[in-house]
């Protein structure tokens, strides 16, 4: 058997005349934390849904754990966990009941379920709230519980659709740490997110999709180096002299009117030259980030 | 996943179990309604109509109004319990709580989820009918052993009216839209299915319409089981009707829900 947990080949998803996913192919390797990035409506959730057999494919083929998802979806789902974008917990039930009842769908014996619930409650710091009803939980606790529930069948693959959206920074960082620990335990994780910092920190590899197609695939650091360089000069406001300088020197840049990004491709001398001659106070030299890559590739106009 | 043949297995019991465990949390409400409802009906209609309607003619028998009406309370409750469960409650689970979405990340098919839900609705009808029959027995309004037939009847009727509820769940865009089938279908059945007066009081054409409706057959069987006057003909015709309608509408409900959910 190959080392790939997920193999996506020329997969398409159409809703009526609208094409949400337009022939994408990628692999996710065992033990990897794989990111699926893209603006709203890019086709991330559609892709995720096809991976666990929630949505049928309109074209192409998709294998998970070596099973064709269209025919082997039961075997696949027995070995994966999904945390949805929208909370789908049983609100009137307690924290513990949510875990144990969900275990029932996998046919996990009650004693085993209780045991696993104990461990998950502890892992996610919910052991003191096990009797609380979901309605009483904070947003962060609910999300932790949703991820705990996705782990009740001890999955080999964990699918997280925007797990940190709407969480405060503390909760988010804590979740990152949990995900890193799960990865160390050998769980393959596929994640969608709008937080580029999150993707850069967590993901071994990622793809950026837009309009149903893959724009790039690679390691976060490699993508930054390739598309924006390690360092970026940012100037705000922009003086006319700088505009002329950049054009004359043929430097790769983005002019946003009130702000200018200059991709200096590791040439620090350019920064010294600029600050000396043009704008001492308005210029900063900063690290290139995944967010720069993302915006450069997917554009800056609003979506939806 | 979207094949036209239903994908069913015993796993549907896991959905049934989930609904049971969640409902158990608020068992008192579930228990009180079928306990008090027959008492309310008997005292209000029984005492209220006692002077207006001293006795009633039903299929050659002379009955007091309470004896005539009591079995219909069970039958209409079977209808309401399953219909409400698989319309409003199922819609809440599907649309607001995203329970179905969550279960669809486990090795269960959409068919199993919906079949489990319908079976749960029928179970609720069965439980309510059991409690109501017990209460009515204390008033001497149920004859045995035929009265025991109410239990399988409640489950069958529950499956049928649950499937009808689920058919609407497959179509409605918002929860308020359930008021439409209640107003156009459930309430007319409640009033015109031989529940509060014998069908013979209606003009012939209206009787024919009434016999086309499922509640009429449910009421007829419930009444004859309670009175101990049930005949094989009765079981064959009305039981056959309910069984055939169930076998038609449950697969239809599964199919339409598959169309709604699998996209």
Describe these PLM feature segments.
Chain B
Residues 1-144, 152-263:
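Hydrophobic transmembrane alpha-helices and immediately adjacent juxtamembrane helices
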């Amino acid at each position: 058997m190959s080392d790939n947990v997920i193999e996506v080949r020329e997969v398409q998803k159409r809703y009526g005349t609208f094409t949400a996913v337009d022939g994408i192919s990628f692999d996710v390797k065992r033990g990897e934390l794989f990111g699926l990035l893209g603006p709203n409506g890019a086709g991330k959730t559609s892709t995720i849904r096809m991976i666990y057999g929630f949505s049928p494919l309109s074209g192409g083929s998709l294998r998970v754990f070596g099973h064709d998802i269209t025919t082997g979806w039961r075997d696949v789902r027995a070995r994966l966990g999904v945390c949805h974008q929208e909370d789908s917990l049983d609100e009137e039930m307690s924290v513990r009941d949510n875990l144990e009842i969900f275990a029932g769908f996998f046919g996990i014996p009650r004693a085993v379920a209780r045991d696993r619930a104990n461990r998950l409650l502890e892992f996610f710091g919910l052991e003191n709230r096990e009797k609380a009803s979901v309605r009483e939980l904070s947003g962060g606790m609910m999300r932790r519980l949703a991820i705990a529930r996705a782990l009740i069948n001890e999955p080999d693959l964990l699918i997280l659709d925007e797990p940190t959206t709407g969480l405060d920074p503390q909760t988010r960082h804590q979740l990152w740490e949990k995900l890193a620990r799960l990865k160390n335990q050998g769980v393959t994780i596929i994640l969608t997110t709008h937080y580029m910092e999150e993707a850069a920190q967590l993901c071994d590899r990622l793809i950026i999709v837009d309009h149903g197609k893959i724009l790039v695939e690679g390691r976060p650091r490699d993508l930054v180096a390739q598309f924006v360089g390690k360092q970026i000069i940012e100037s705000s406001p922009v003086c006319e002299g700088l505009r002329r300088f950049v054009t004359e020197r043929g430097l790769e840049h983005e002019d946003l009117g009130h702000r200018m990004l200059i991709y200096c491709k590791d040439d620090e001398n350019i920064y010294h030259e600029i600050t000396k001659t043009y704008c001492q106070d308005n210029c900063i030299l900063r690290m290139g980030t995944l967010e720069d890559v993302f915006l450069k590739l997917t554009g800056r106009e609003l979506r939806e | 996943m979207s094949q036209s043949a239903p994908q069913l297995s015993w796993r549907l019991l896991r959905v049934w179990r989930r609904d049971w465990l969640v409902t158990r949390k608020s068992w008192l409400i579930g228990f009180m309604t079928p306990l008090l409802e027959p008492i309310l009906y008997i005292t209000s209609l029984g005492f209220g109509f006692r002077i207006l309607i001293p006795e009633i003619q039903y299929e050659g028998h002379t009955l007091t109004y309470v004896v005539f009406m009591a079995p219909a309370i069970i039958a209409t409750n079977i209808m309401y319990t399953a219909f409400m469960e698989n319309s409003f409650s199922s819609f809440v689970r599907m649309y607001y709580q995203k329970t179905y979405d969550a279960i669809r990340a486990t090795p269960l098919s959409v068919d199993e989820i919906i079949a489990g839900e319908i079976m749960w609705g029928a179970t609720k009808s069965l439980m309510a009918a059991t409690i109501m029959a017990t209460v009515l027995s204390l008033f001497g309004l149920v004859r045995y052993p035929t009265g025991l037939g109410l239990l399988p009847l409640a489950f069958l009727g529950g499956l049928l009216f649950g499937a009808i509820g689920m058919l609407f769940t497959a179509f409605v865009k918002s929860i308020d839209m359930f008021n439409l089938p209640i107003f156009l279908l459930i309430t007319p059945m409640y009033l015109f299915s031989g529940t509060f007066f014998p069908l013979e009081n209606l003009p012939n054409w209206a009787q024919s319409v009434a016999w086309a409706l499922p509640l009429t057959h449910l009421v007829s069987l419930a009444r004859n089981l309670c009175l101990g006057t049930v005949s094989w003909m009765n079981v064959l015709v009305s039981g056959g009707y309910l069984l055939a309608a169930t076998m038609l509408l449950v697969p239809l409900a599964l199919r339409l829900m598959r169309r709604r959910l699998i996209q």
